[in-house]
Amino acid sequence: MSFNHKTIEELHDLLVAKEISATELTQKTLEDIKSREEAVGSFITVSEEAALKQAAAIDAKGIDADNLMSGIPLAVKDNISTKGTLTTAASKMLYNYEPIFDATSVANAYAKDMIVIGKTNMDEFAMGGSTETSYFKKTKNAWDHTKVPGGSSGGSATAVASGQVRLSLGSDTGGSIRQPAAFNGVVGLKPTYGTVSRYGLIAFGSSLDQIGPFAPTVKENAQLLNVIASSDVKDATSAPVRIADYTSKIGRDIKGMKIALPKEYLGEGIDPEIKETVLAAAKQFEALGATVEEVSLPHSKYGVAVYYIIASSEASSNLQRFDGIRYGFRADDAKNLDEIYVNTRSQGFGDEVKRRIMLGTFSLSSGYYDAYFKKAGQVRTLIIEDFDKVFADYDLILGPTTPTVAFGLDTLNHDPVAMYLADLLTIPVNLAGLPGISIPAGFVDGLPVGLQLIGPKYAEETIYQAAAAFETVTDYHKQQPIIFGGDK
């Protein structure tokens, strides 16, 4: 018997009633991972021994009836530090790295007696939109194994979509939670910048990165955010704001809610069928009592250019620490210190990571800083101001998560610009530090379409309220791929 169709609340009730034990649930989850892993390749590391040991300890002390997450398995993206467990960021550079500490988000999960079942595949150092830049393997879409799962958190999304786990953690720098959530038909949230501590997250773009949850439903996503969100003295960018319960507005109606639909989000480059899906969703929100009106975000069209200057510049700085001296990969053909640095970085980083380091180094270099990095920061401010103007009059922004459905494996990984444009609709949210969610909203050619809801800072409760209301009048979140036992 598999438990992967049961919600977290249903699993909790079974655990409290002692109809199953944490050990049995963990064993079944491990079986689900193993039976599907060859098809989708979601995991870099499966922590079987450690997970079963933790489950046995939870069983020994007993399930806490007041702790919803007690005994629940969790998959964690492989750029989030886990003490004593490989944390590779899907890079040769960190192929043997075992942290001596847990990321705060992982520590928060352990504090709630969650069981870390394994580490999921991703684009190397979270740089990519297809999980094809991983040093270890290419993850495949849960709905069509010839398509990409999205990225960079492709393994975390596919693990949930394929029924390997119920919950997972990812990170989002320019869409890396929302895009794979859309491609795999699950719920993925990028919280407000600073809501979840970045301590223990292997840094890519420090002003953009944010850890967030994946789940099959809106409520379960909010329940996981309740666990991982916290203020943290170990993270200087951690926000002091802490919502008591992110599920508090789920179930409320949305009558009177004002939702903005930017005309730029349905313009050039957006698949016509995705546009139709979003417009149909807008009608659903109106039927639920919300007002949906067209607005403009005029500077959003510059988002991709701004993002790749800022993110690459921050990456070139953050990745300077990987030099073969203290930990990780070291080239064995070096004859002096200079060759250790050069050979280690040349051999340890993949092509996409090296491309971004070079772009970032150029943008920060003397003579080009003002023309590129400084200018990008100025345009970023204009993008933020556009959002501020809209949120002065509206509660949420609605639009597609991605311009297309999942594309084929090995189709865009040799065309960096085309790959970058796949994040066209998610990037502005990171630049502004806003919360955004992707929820299942339909299908095009048998592949899931994601609907994105964006809110002002710390409006996760309102986002969840609207997203959950949409779930009540649609069944897209209930449809599952064949690998999960569905009929698609």
UniProtKB/Swiss-Prot annotation:
InterPro entries documented for this protein: Amidase, Amidase_CS, Amidase_dom, AS_sf, GatA
Gene Ontology terms, MF aspect: ATP binding; glutaminyl-tRNA synthase (glutamine-hydrolyzing) activity
GO terms (BP aspect): translation
Keywords: ATP-binding, Ligase, Nucleotide-binding, Protein biosynthesis
Membrane-traversing stretches: none
Gene Ontology cellular-component terms listed: glutamyl-tRNA(Gln) amidotransferase complex
Annotated catalytic residues: 77 (charge relay system), 152 (charge relay system), 176 (acyl-ester intermediate)
Catalytic activity: L-glutamyl-tRNA(Gln) + L-glutamine + ATP + H2O = L-glutaminyl-tRNA(Gln) + L-glutamate + ADP + phosphate + H(+)
Highest taxon listed in the record's lineage: Bacteria
Job of this protein: Allows the formation of correctly charged Gln-tRNA(Gln) through the transamidation of misacylated Glu-tRNA(Gln) in organisms which lack glutaminyl-tRNA synthetase. The reaction takes place in the presence of glutamine and ATP through an activated gamma-phospho-Glu-tRNA(Gln).
Subunit (UniProt): Heterotrimer of A, B and C subunits.
Family per record: Belongs to the amidase family. GatA subfamily.
NCBIfam families for this protein: gatA
Protein name: Glutamyl-tRNA(Gln) amidotransferase subunit A
Taxonomic source organism: Streptococcus pyogenes serotype M2 (strain MGAS10270)
The encoding gene: gatA
